[in-house]
Amino acid sequence: GPALGFTRYVQNHRIPSPELDAFSSGRNWADASDASVEIWVESEEAFSVACASPEAAEAGLILEQDEKRFTSAKKISAFLGQEHVIFDHLAASHRFGPEDKTVKMVCQVWKRPELNAAAFQERWRIGHGNLVRQLAEPMGFKRYVQTHPVSSPTVAAFAGPRGWRQPPDGLTEIWWESEQALIHSFSAPEAAEAGAVLQKDEVQFVDPKKVTAFLAREHVVF
């Protein structure tokens, strides 16, 4: 991690959720991945400097060899992103404490082909972000984060030799206090109404057939 400039590393492990599966299929979303990884760096510049060192090259080879043992490279993608916390009603003690029961939806977002990246990101962050904030209570949403891609030759150079595929146009993460809270929220008529409003807005700027989502628990490695 340190040799590559990594400052934080979190694994999101998929857990079964008939409720979220129904939510996804109702939107005609694609099949989701088995897990996702989030890695933090201080900046693109710091990451680029770290990756230029001999130690980083050696560490990268070790990681690549290990990845081949349990992942399918052609199904993996990566991008450098900037987080936008739209709202956060989860106390840190609740999210990371010993009694942490939080779960989150990890959603790869793809834009409609006629939109450029700037128009898509503005529509997603401002228009849709405000709508999600308004409908958070009936949906049981406690925290909502959008991650927007930023240009990174370093990440492209890291992903290319590994044969990774094209990354999505963004990532959505939505937290619930617990799996039980998600189930309770999704069973309420108010959630169905709010979900329909969100879906009507989503199709104006996302490509549903490429979007994927799964329910996960966070595992903070460091």
Where do the protein language model's features map onto the residues?
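Macromolecular interaction modules
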Residues: 1-222
